[in-house]
Amino acid sequence: MRDCSILKKRPELLIEREIKRYIRWAVFDAHLLFNRDSIPVYAIHPHRVGDSIINGVKRLDNRLKALAARYSDDSSAHLYADDDSLLYPVFTGFLICGPILTIMTYSADPRDRTETTDSNFISQFDLGEWGQDVWNSLALVITVMHIRRTMLQLVEKGLGGIYRAEGNILSNGDTDEDL
């Protein structure tokens, strides 16, 4: 992260790639597969050069709201309309501005929001700060585990176009010790 200035690379792209790697690992570890029409439970918004931070926050907020609306419109969500245990996922958003990572959430539960409800600010981390590498990584992993748990809850309800792979999906034929 701190080498981005030496390498003349934008930190947003590096951070986005690493977040996606963490999420891919969590999905693989949980043996999750996705339909073509599956609804992601997270959004990543790297800051654009020349764009204001407020516009980035608004864009991420709109993306999270669009995911929640897409989930609400999903026909499979209405199958359990009379069920009190209907699952409304919490969508997680990552806003990346330079070395700063901001985590936001938005609930798909219509009881938790109104038309003017915005995403909730969870936390902000300076990934370029010396001595905070372990703590920042831990915070990111905890957030990714929350995303994974949300996906697993959707699998249990048969929602969101996510399902669990049958059998062993490890490429080398080994068995997964976690299962």
Task: Please tell me what each predicted stretch does.
Residues M1-T92, P99-I100, A108-R113, T117-L179:
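A short, conserved, highly charged catalytic patch centered on acidic carboxylates
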